[in-house]
Curated annotation (Swiss-Prot):
InterPro entries (alphabetical): Leu-rich_rpt (IPR001611), Leu-rich_rpt_typical-subtyp (IPR003591), LRR_dom_sf (IPR032675), LRR_domain-containing (IPR050216), LRR_R13L4/SHOC2-like (IPR055414)
Assigned keywords, A-Z: Cytoplasm, Leucine-rich repeat, Muscle protein, Repeat
Function field: Component of the sarcomeric M-band which plays a role in myocyte response to biomechanical stress. May regulate expression of other M-band proteins via an SRF-dependent pathway. Important for normal contractile function in heart.
Tissue: Expressed in heart and skeletal muscle (at protein level). Also detected in kidney (at protein level). Not detected in other tissues tested (at protein level).
Protein's gene: Lrrc39
Swiss-Prot/TrEMBL induction comment: In cardiomyocytes, down-regulated in response to biomechanical stress.
Name listed for the protein in its UniProt record: Leucine-rich repeat-containing protein 39
LRR-type repeats, residues: 59-82, 83-105, 106-128, 129-151, 153-175, 176-198, 199-221, 223-244, 245-269, 272-295
Source organism per UniProt: Rattus norvegicus
């Protein structure tokens, strides 16, 4: 019986030893695999960095990374070795996301990642205090982080054709140098408060959205000289539009406007307006022009049409008032 106990104990010990050896072997294999994977990543990063370096050029004194129509769904961390870059120009690369380490490129002046498949803007974007241009048109972005308001040098922001952006954080009104904003072809139903409060904004495109009404506070954009609102569902214009003294270009084609407010005659800075393809209640025909160029200008600019429409509207209104106030004769002869 004693021999049986000793034998059982020996077997148990041998089993434990073998289990320990097997466990150690598995761990060694795992470590070896991880080491090999690490070597592969290091090698791939080096290869990627070499490829990226080939895409770096100097133009007008700026260091630019330019990639066109070449697949780069992600950008490797080895790109950080090129942190002196001042411009990224990556178009049609299939890029899925802006890297989280973007904030470490403190020298960036222009970030142009248009025509990719980017779905979000990382909060680290706010660390780019020297950034002057951010161009993210033709992507799949749905929201804009409030941290973007920390890009104090930003002058140009393009978010066109992302199709699903419907609002902007109010913090973006802190972008005191922003002069150019393109929000066309998205899902905005009104002009965001942040936009109305951007003090330096000169150029705004909100065409091809779902705007139905323009806010009465539209005239807060006193620096605005160009406003594109084509292809929306706008039904009327606020009277306060007369106060936009610097507005020179106003495009309202393909909307649901039924009238042109008479106060627009006071907008002496207007040089280009377009009311084409609106269900206006009055039909106004301009007198023929003496030359072909003049006819093209009439049709394209619409400024003469606007003034003619307002005059016709007033004339029609005067006729209605006259008919309303004409006393009817109730006396009979004899």
């Amino acid at each position: 019986m004693t021999e049986s106990v000793v034998c059982t104990g020996a077997v148990s010990t041998v089993k434990e030893v073998w289990e320990e050896r097997i466990k150690k072997h598995h761990e060694d294999v795992k470590r070896e695999k991880e080491f090999q994977q690490k070597l592969v990543r290091i090698w791939e990063d080096r290869v990627s960095l070499t490829k990226l370096k080939e895409k770096v050029t100097r133009e007008d004194g700026r260091i630019i990374l330019r990639i066109e129509k070449e697949e780069w769904k992600t950008l490797p961390s080895s790109l950080l070795k090129l942190n002196q870059l001042q411009e990224w120009q990556l178009h049609r690369t299939g890029l899925l996301k802006i890297p989280e380490f973007i904030g470490r490129f403190q020298h960036l002046i222009v970030l142009d990642l248009s025509r990719n498949t980017i779905s979000e803007i990382p909060r680290g974007i706010g660390l780019l205090t020297r950034l002057q241009e951010l161009i993210l048109s033709y992507n799949k972005i749905k929201t804009v982080p409030k941290e973007l308001s920390n890009c104090a040098s930003l002058e140009k922001l393009e978010l066109a054709v992302n199709r699903d952006i419907s609002d902007l954080p109010t913090e973006l009104s802190k972008l005191l140098k922003l002069t150019h904003l393109d929000l066309s072809m998205n899902q905005f139903t009104t002009i965001p408060l942040a936009v109305l409060d951007m003090p330096a904004l000169e150029w705004l495109d909100m065409g091809s959205n779902s705007l139905q009404q323009l806010p009465d506070t539209l005239d807060r954009m006193q620096s605005l000289h160009t406003l594109w609102l084509q292809r929306n569902e706008i039904t009327c214009l606020p009277e306060t539009i007369r106060n936009m003294k610097n507005l020179g270009t106003l495009v309202l084609s393909n909307n649901k406007l039924q009238d042109i407010p008479g106060c627009m005659e006071e907008m002496t800075s207007l040089r280009f307006v377009n009311f084409r393809d609106n269900p206006l209640r009055l039909e106004v025909t301009l007198p023929p022009s003496d030359d072909v160029d003049g006819e093209e200008e009439q049709e394209l600019f619409g400024l003469q049409f606007m003034h003619a429409y307002i005059q016709e509207s007033r004339r029609t209104e005067d006729q209605v008032n006259c008919l309303t106030h004409t006393p009817s004769s109730t006396r009979s002869d004899g």
